[in-house]
Amino acid sequence: MRHLIAVLTLVVLNGLLSMPALAGDNSQYDPALAERAGADEYGMKQYVLAFLKKGPNRDRSKEEAEKLQRDHLDNIGRMAKAGKLVLAGPFLNDGELRGIYIFNVRTVEEAKALTETDPAVQAGSLVMELLPWYGSAALVEVNELHKKMAKKAI
């Protein structure tokens, strides 16, 4: 059920982000920005969505868990810097679903290769469910905007 709620939330947010593009011609259209983002004529593009779930191997000491989390966050930063990850974050509960990634890649295979670089996946602490997803191309701008809003680095 939580999985369904998360997906429905993303669908609603994506719809709200893309509504101006669906209303007809857009006087604010910036062709250079659209091309840079890889947008189609509706300002949308294909991504791969990853649901991070609890893996089978989560029994660690506090120190090991903290190091694994640090390595996991470093990997997120590396993928974001490379332009392959446009959004990442945890769910704010202690359920089976731990977080979400939105990969800026066209295929599930590309996303799978990226998830395999995650130390938490390698250690069996997390497993990923990957789904092709169509959303606003504006998401590729999130990481640059985030840098301007974050007082402290993660």
Where are these regions (language model features)?
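Positively charged n-region of N-terminal signal peptides that target proteins for export
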Residues: 1-4
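Bacterial N-terminal signal peptides
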Residues: 6-18
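Conserved, structured core segments of small domains
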Residues: 22-154
